Structure formats: C-alpha cells, structure tokens
Regions:
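Conserved AMP-binding/adenylation subdomain of ANL enzymes
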Residues: 24-41, 49-89, 104
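Active-site phosphate/pyrophosphate- and oxyanion-stabilizing loops and adjacent acidic/basic residues
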Residues: 4, 28, 99, 129
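Conserved AMP-binding A3 loop
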Residues: 1-25
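Alpha-helix capping/helix-boundary segments
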Residues: 75, 97-98, 124
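Short beta-strand->loop structural element characteristic of the AMP-binding/adenylate-forming
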Residues: 14-17, 44-45, 66-73, 140
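Conserved S/T- and glycine-rich ATP-binding loop of Class I adenylate-forming
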Residues: 6-9, 42, 48, 83, ...
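Short hydrophobic "strand-cap" motifs at the C-terminus of beta-strands
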Residues: 3, 33, 45-46, 71, ...
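Gly/Ser/Thr-rich phosphate-binding loop
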Residues: 63, 85-93, 102-169
Length: 169
C-alpha cells in the first residue's frame, strides 16, 4: 500500500490510499499515454510524495525500463542545467513550474537540450506555446485524481477554450 498526498485542489491536501497493483497497472498503461520508452531519460524535479511524479513519471519509467533522474527539489535556475546534465528527454511538472522556468532570462542556446515532451498541470496556453518555441519541448496538459480511477488529458491537436466570458445586457 502507498499513501499519496493529494494536491488539495478541492480542499486541504489529504493522504489517499493507492495499492501496489494500481501503481503497477498505471505504470504499464502510462508508458503509452506519455510516450515513455526504454531510451528515455525521465527527469523528476517534483516531490515523489505527489501523484504526478509517481504516476506520470516514476511508474511508467520503471515499467518501460527507462532511466530516472532525480533532484533534491525543483529549481527554475537549475532546471536547464539539470536537463542538460542528465540528457533528459521527458519530465513532469505541476503548478506554476513552467512559468517560473520561462521567467528565467532567455539564452540563444535554450533549445540545446534533449527534451522532447513533458506532462503536467496548470501551464497556461501561452506558456505551453512559449515553452515549445524556446526549449523545443511539447507540453501535454492533463488532470487526474490521486484517489480516482480516471485521467483527463487534452488531445495534442485540440484547441483550448478561451478563458474569458462576455456578458450582454
């Protein structure tokens, strides 16, 4: 049995029970969902007590026989040096991590890395486009529930809904 701490999206963070069988099944199925194979180097800057790091990176990488590169903590300053050091091809993120990375000063060699794709939550449409342009890495946004059985993922070719509302009188 594994206790995962939820993000607290709907209230206070809480411990959710996850069986070893569920984690193993998620690892096997998420290899295809996140396009993780044996040749990938999966960079994990997020804490392993969170479902994103465990279910979208660690378990699929383990199932695929890929390499996992861990860091002590997320650092926007250390992100690109770590990615280059490990020759990372995939990573996961949560919250505002992408905007923090994009907030670092640009360099002409930002795209000089091995990253191909990443999975996470809460990056704005503008940040998704900027990250691809700057680093050459496609971000896939999704939402899952640590204690639930489902995952919502945006199709790679889907258009995002506009986040504005106009009222008429």
């Amino acid at each position: 049995m594994l206790l995962l701490l939820t993000s607290g999206t709907t209230g206070a963070s809480k411990a959710a029970i996850c069986s070893q069988g569920r984690l193993a099944a998620l690892g096997a199925s998420n290899c295809a969902k996140y396009d993780i194979g044996r040749a990938d180097v999966c960079y994990c800057p997020m804490p392993l007590f969170h479902g994103n790091a465990l279910m979208a990176l660690w378990a699929p990488a383990l199932s695929a026989g890929a390499t996992i590169a861990l860091t002590e903590r997320f650092s926007a300053t250390g992100f690109l040096p770590d990615v280059r050091h490990f020759a990372a091809t995939y990573f996961t993120y949560v919250g505002k991590a992408i905007s923090y990375i994009l907030g670092r000063p640009e360099s002409a060699d930002d795209a000089d890395n091995h990253l191909t794709h990443a999975f996470g939550t809460e990056a704005s449409p503008e940040d998704v486009a900027a990250f691809l342009h700057r680093f050459g890495c496609r971000l896939v946004e999704g939402y899952g529930s640590s204690e639930g059985g489902g995952l919502l993922r945006q199709a790679p070719d889907a258009r995002r809904a506009r986040s504005e509302c106009r009222a008429r009188a």
